[in-house]
A protein has these predicted regions:
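Short, surface-exposed secondary-structure edge patches
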Residues: 1-3, 26
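Intrinsically disordered, low-complexity, charged/polar segments
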Residues: 39-86
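Short, solvent-exposed secondary-structure boundary/capping segments
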Residues: 28-36
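Short, well-ordered loop/turn sites that connect or cap secondary structure elements
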Residues: 3-4, 13
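Short beta-strand-centered aromatic/proline hotspots
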Residues: 17-27
Length: 86
């Protein structure tokens, strides 16, 4: 699985509203790691009650893929190395 970049816009299964990805590999309060953190699209971040943790397999449709460059690719590569250590 390749993680989508921040800024990507997706629709989750059985959801009415699109989400924009604002974070990747985020932990919830119990320490469980999710692939993405998202906020409503097109509104953006409203408050902490309107952000959503979800996994790649929850995505039904990808409307837009966010910006990708060498900086992001190096970040993802380093992140993958750290995850393999655990």
């Amino acid at each position: 699985m390749v993680l989508l970049p921040v800024g990507s816009v997706v629709k989750l299964e059985e959801a009415n509203k699109k989400l924009m990805i604002i974070g990747i590999l985020q932990k919830n309060g119990d320490g469980e790691i999710y692939d993405y953190l998202g906020c409503p699209y097109p509104e953006g971040f409203l408050d902490a009650d309107n952000i959503f943790l979800f996994n790649h397999n929850d995505i039904e449709d990808i409307s837009f893929i966010g910006y990708d460059d060498i900086e992001r690719q190096l970040f993802i590569k380093n992140l993958e190395k750290e995850l393999q250590k655990k």
